[in-house]
Amino acid sequence: MAKFLEYQGKEWLAKGGMPVPKGRVASSPEEAEEVARWIGGPVAVKGQVQAGGRGKAGIVKLADTPEQAKALAKEILSKTVQGLPVKQVLVEEKLDIKKEYYCSFVVNNSREARSPMLMFSAEGGMDIESVDESLLFKFNIDPMYGLRSYDAVDICAKAGIAPEDLSKFASFLTKLSALYKKYDCQMLEINQIGRAHV
């Protein structure tokens, strides 16, 4: 079973028609500076390891200039997180995120269900593990039909998405569900889904 680093996951999502920030992976401080120059504005420099809590581990930083991106990449590439050395950084455009959401598709192996399950919350971000269970909405998906639009609208409404945004969020979730099914994923998690405008 393949496990993706963040940049690999974003490449995969982009190929599936999902919106992702402009960015590229870099293996050296010099490459990070080059990518930041190509982006042409403030960037996020994000260490690439298969571990949670990267923000708290200090391997996700913001830079205003290519020179800052180079210095931060040098610092991040010298670190180890949960025993894993950081060998690459993702340098991507810094977005002005107004609101964060959480979404995952997993296999529900309970005896009653044995089906894909969507988990969605309007409370995404670094501390998703501490979010109250009542704010994490779960829905068992019919394996034959996938996530249907009206079910996606329903779960978004329950999560507190504004009525005028229900169609957009539901469309996003149904596209993700289709990718999850198409590639026979065991798990597809996005934390966080960022919204630049509210």
Predicted regions, residues:
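ATP-grasp fold ATP-binding core
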Residues: 6-8, 12-13, 38-54, 83-97, ...
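Cap/lid and interdomain-hinge subdomains that line or gate substrate/regulatory clefts
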Residues: 124-169
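Conserved small/polar residues in nucleotide/adenosyl-binding loops
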Residues: 196-198
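A long amphipathic alpha-helix within ATP-dependent nucleotide-binding catalytic cores
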Residues: 151-193
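Glycine-rich phosphate-binding loop of ATP-grasp-fold ATP-dependent ligases
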Residues: 20-23, 45-72, 102, 115, ...
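A conserved helix-loop-beta module that forms one wall/lid of the active-site cleft
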Residues: 1-41
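Active-site cofactor/substrate anionic-group-binding motifs, chiefly glycine-
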Residues: 38-44, 62-86, 123-126
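Hydrophobic alpha-helical hairpins/lids featuring a short glycine-rich hinge
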Residues: 82-140
